[in-house]
Amino acid sequence: MTPVKPALLSANRVHVAFPGLHGAPDARAVDGVDLGIRRGEIVALVGESGCGKTTLARALLGLVAPTGGGVVFDGRPLEYSGRSLKAYRKRVQLVLQDPSGSLNPRHTVYDAVAEGLRIHGHRGDEQAAVAEALSRAGLRPPERFFLRHPHELSGGQRQRVVIAGALVLEPELLVADEPVASLDASVRGEILALLLRLRDELALSALVVTHDLGLAWNIADRVAVMYLGRIVETGPVEQVLTAPRHPYTRALLSVLPEAPGDPVVLTGEPPDPSRVPPGCRFHARCPILAGGEAERAGVAEACRTRDPGILTGDDTVQVACHWAAAR
């Protein structure tokens, strides 16, 4: 049996809460998350807008300090002092969803990619490093792009420049927040193929944050489904997406164009993160509970009153659902 590699980056019971206004309770944006990403692995973090996935990504990047729990990178707890954080951010790079907003319209492609090198005091051949990063990102020959400005590039080329700006520092892990959301469908596949190639060639790890389970299917090794600040289902992507166990995962999958049957329409909106309901945090919108299936399984009361707990974030398929556990 092949031993499981230790996580390169892991969240350990991470909480991120924001103070409420005018004495209101704190908003629990991330409410106890365990998540691990190994070397050479792509993990998709999936959920609706407002579920806490971007806040979790910011905590993993060191952009916001957890209010509970912690982040471990390469076996060492993440420190939030200036020097330690600067060294960490060289090894873990962010790729944003909107390349137009990420790139200064006045800067050339060369300057945009070289910016990270200058911030981190790179002492080698800057031009060679920029050329190598652009080439790895699929902009060849790289010298053709040095003096271009963002408005002279297509959307896909701009996203490749953003990726090159991350690659130039030779990171070990990318955090990509909706990396293809702003791109035309014809270009999305090219960027996803690029991320897969970088994983294979460089053993580069990635956390891909997305609302799109279809994207997760195409790129990820593992998937973590997030709802109201918690991971509610996680595991190898093929197992989770072909045989989803949590009602929320099932609902997200049901609206994909290729999904069989009728889409599951969830009623209402996710609860306010400052007023997380007792029991399963999904129970107020759960079609299994509303349809009587949880009652027939003898778990309806548990759904309403008992927290399913925090998933451990390991390689196995895990689900935070009383009904799924009873089946």
Predicted regions and their residues:
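Short catalytic/signature loops enriched in Gly
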Residues: 5-7, 26, 234-327
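ABC transporter nucleotide-binding domains
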Residues: 1-242, 325-327
